[in-house]
Design a protein with these regions (language model features):
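Conserved beta-strand-loop-alpha-helix junction that forms the acyl-donor binding cleft
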Residues: 105-114, 132, 136
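A short beta-loop-alpha structural element at the N-terminal edge
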Residues: 1-14
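A short, internal acetyl-CoA/4′-phosphopantetheine-binding micro-motif in the GNAT/acyltransferase core
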Residues: 72-79
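Conserved acetyl-CoA-binding loop of GNAT-fold acetyltransferases
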Residues: 118-128
Length: 140
């Protein structure tokens, strides 16, 4: 499996993955944030590729000097195989390269089900934030 930056040729595969994995409402919100993040800094959109297939995606952003994991999605058939963990690890490295000192999980009603996954990574309650103001990639 390879974790790499999103490329324009990945767009259809990523959109299909998000539609498959996320609820309709969540997918709509995520696609808007995804497009904005791509226009601002595509290096913070990562894909997990296995045998030429996109099996996971992570959308990160930097907002007010903090790094945020906004959305992570992994194909169901590839869950519990380290895909999400690898995406998070690679994003944390990207944040470190940019001198981001605090990395947070942007928590919203759509990713509450991921809490056990994040707990398995050793994250603490202080690593989660439900911003009172929407992140720039969400607010537009």
């Amino acid at each position: 499996m390879q974790i790499r930056s999103f490329q324009l040729s990945d767009y259809r595969s990523v959109a299909e993955l998000l539609e498959e994995v996320l609820s309709e409402e969540c997918c709509e919100e995520t696609m808007g944030a995804f497009a904005r993040q791509l226009s601002w800094d595509s290096e913070l959109v990562l894909v997990a590729e296995k045998e030429g297939e996109i099996v996971g995606v992570l959308i990160g952003t930097i907002d007010q000097s903090k790094g945020y994991v906004y959305r992570i999605a992994v194909q169901e058939a590839f869950r519990m195989q380290g895909v999400g963990r690898s995406l998070i690890s690679t994003m944390n490295n990207r944040f470190r390269q940019r001198k981001v000192m605090k990395v947070l999980i942007a928590e919203d009603k759509h990713n509450e089900l991921l809490r056990p996954f994040y707990d398995s990574l050793g994250l603490k309650p202080s690593d989660f934030v439900n911003p009172t103001q929407p992140l720039s990639i969400v607010a537009g």
